[in-house]
Every structure is written in structure tokens, then in C-alpha cells.
Amino acid sequence: LHYDVMDGHFVPNISFGAPVLECLHKALPEVFYDVHLMISHPLQYAEPFIKAGASLYNFHLECEDDIQQTIDAVKALGCKVGLTIKPGTAPEALEPYLDQLDLVLVMSVEPGFGGQKFMPSALDKLRWLKAEKDRRGLKFLLEVDGGVDAATAPQCVAAGADVLVAGSAIFGAADPAAAVRAMAAL
């Protein structure tokens, strides 16, 4: 389950916190919780979210905290770690951290609002990251989020994406279960 966290500062919207995640985790402990933190200071929230049930703590390269210190803190808490890049950030900026990551998320829209149109430039980023992953023998998963639908999902998979985040395409579909099945079949 991709769980978006927004602080009203890094992005304009505000969403769920650690207490809601804790309730979800208690009700559905078998679910993998990919916690995507669109927040300015992910370091200070690592422990509360991981204790609440985060399976993967996924924060933005563009945050205000020290990236290495945050990665180290998440790993010390026994959690998988991911880094996310916004549409305006080059994938090469992730190079110093790639060998420490369990997941890299490429945003294909500006973070903070659902229902936006997919930015095709994300495909080049996915291709570069997939090539770098293969060249270096790394194991991180590649995830894409934003504007992913029946038309863009196959392009993302072809570019190297392992994980697709599709909110509006699923929850706005006449038959959400069929939309999930169609994407899972890719």
C-alpha cells in the first residue's frame, strides 16, 4: 500500500500521519506499507512512522534534512529505505546513494496533488536508473508515481519500472478492481 504523507510545507497539502498508519497496520498487519514522505524534515519522523508500521520509509532527495543521516537512521531502525525525486531533479543526483537503497521513486507529476497528467520525461529517468542499476549490479526497485494509467503504465514498465503507483486511475475507474487487475497483468 502506497501511503502518502504531506506536511503542508514541502507540498501544499496535508495528509495522514503516523497514528493513522498505526491503525491501518493493526487492522492489516500483513500489508507492505510503502510510506512516501512528501515532507521537509523526514529525519525527525523516521522513528514514529517506522514504529507505526512503515515497511519502507521513502523520502525526497529534495528535503531539507541530511540525506545520508536520514538513510542511516532509517536503516538503524531496521526499515527499508527509498529515495524519491521530483520531476525537476536529474536522476544522476541519486548516484551517491543508489547502493544503499531498497527503492527509488520517480515522480511523474509534481508531488502533492492527485489527478495530474503524466510527464513523459519520467520515462528517460526510469531508463537511466534501470541502466545504472544493471551496470552496477544493484537490487533496488524502481517505482513511478503520478499520472499512471492504462496508457502510461506499459510505457513505465518498458522503461524499467517495477512498481506502479496509480491512484486516480484506480479510484476514478468505473470498476476499480478491473483497473487493478489490468495493471497487475503488466
Predicted regions span which residues?
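Active-site beta-loop-alpha junctions enriched in small/polar residues
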Residues: 6-8, 38-42, 62-64, 86-88, ...
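C-terminal helical cap(s) of enzyme catalytic domains, especially alpha/beta-barrels
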Residues: 157, 169-186
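Glycine-rich, proline-tolerant flexible connector loops at the mouths of alpha/beta enzymes
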Residues: 1-20, 61, 109-117
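Alpha-helix-loop-beta-strand connector modules within alpha/beta enzyme cores
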Residues: 14-35, 73-84, 122-142, 146, ...
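Conserved, mostly hydrophobic/aromatic
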Residues: 4, 49, 104, 129, ...
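A short alpha/beta connector and helix-capping loop motif
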Residues: 9-42, 46, 153-170
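Catalytic cores of alpha/beta
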Residues: 43-51, 89-101, 146-164
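Conserved anion-binding
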Residues: 44-45, 54-141
